[in-house]
């Protein structure tokens, strides 16, 4: 479910040493399964453990997860990264905004999941997003760009070299992707 790297465990162990005995950590998702989902980590003293919490044991600590957050934390990773600028705790939870779909789910659901969990987080760095409008009978995924992608001069490259390659690699049953956006260049456009 959740992977906590050794560096992160050491970081948490130092913090927990200054807390009430028996205190562990809680990993949670606020607004799970929505575009506004946010992940967090907090202290979890013994009296804050709920009966339906899932306890995950690690070498240096335990983490508690509530039953609502649990499915949205599949494949999550907590790391403690140090570089020239300092150190920081990172929590990556690719399924926080959308629950992972089964491998045998309908193609449209699997494509939508990859767009929301893998593609859109990358586009969000430029203020953009892409939505799946439909999958045609011929096997084309019809997409619509929004935000900073609308009118961006790099949108064709992003569509063909980024999104299409990723989707065709994951879903051989697709024949390609098409953009149905009426692009209008403006201040909102990234490039």
From Swiss-Prot:
One of its GO terms (biological process) is protein maturation. Its cofactor is [4Fe-4S] cluster. It comes from the Bacteria. [4Fe-4S] cluster binds at residues 149, 152. Pfam families: Fe-S_biosyn (PF01521), NifU (PF01106). GO terms for molecular function: 4 iron, 4 sulfur cluster binding; iron ion binding. Gene3D superfamilies: Fe-S cluster assembly (FSCA) (3.30.300.130), HesB-like domain (2.60.300.12). SUPFAM superfamilies: Fe-S cluster assembly (FSCA) domain-like, HesB-like domain. InterPro entries: Fe/S_biogenesis_protein_NfuA (IPR017726), FeS_biogenesis (IPR000361), FSCA_dom_sf (IPR034904), HesB-like_dom_sf (IPR035903), NIF_FeS_clus_asmbl_NifU_C (IPR001075). Keywords: 4Fe-4S, Iron, Iron-sulfur, Metal-binding. Transmembrane segments: none annotated. Binds 1 [4Fe-4S] cluster per subunit. The cluster is presumably bound at the interface of two monomers. Belongs to the NfuA family. Involved in iron-sulfur cluster biogenesis. Binds a 4Fe-4S cluster, can transfer this cluster to apoproteins, and thereby intervenes in the maturation of Fe/S proteins. Could also act as a scaffold/chaperone for damaged Fe/S proteins. Homodimer. NCBIfam families: PRK11190.1 (NF008392), YhgI_GntY (TIGR03341). HAMAP family: Fe_S_biogen_NfuA. This is Fe/S biogenesis protein NfuA. The gene is nfuA.
